[in-house]
Amino acid sequence: MKTLAYLILCLAPLAMAGGQTDGPAPGKVTLVYFWAEWCAPCKMVTPALQEMASSDADIALRKIDLTNATEESYGVKALPTVKVYNRGGSLVGTVVGADVGKVKSYVAQAKSGG
């Protein structure tokens, strides 16, 4: 629960400013995806993440565009970064880079209660 509160506090300014996210979706496995327009690996991974979320009602995708922000302000060191949260809002894992297989592995772990 501590992780969920931290994430909400970090993302609250985005939500208040009409940003792309409102934090983890209650009762769903949530992918918080940090990306930027200029990021070539992001362009490769975006369609796969969108497909995962659109084909599975248990998965919510929250995209955070860092095109005009710094990665450090969100604790992100490189793009793309995907943070996978379980249904309870606890962080299951973080994937740095365009490794969709690793994201799917964390999603499976999150669905099984991890």
Kindly give the residue locations of the regions a language model identified.
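Bacterial N-terminal signal peptides
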Residues: 5-14
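A short beta-strand-turn-helix
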Residues: 16-29, 68, 72-73
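Thiol-based oxidoreductase modules, predominantly thioredoxin-like and allied folds used
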Residues: 33-34, 46, 50, 56-69
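Non-catalytic, surface beta->alpha helical segment in thiol-disulfide oxidoreductase systems
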Residues: 83-114
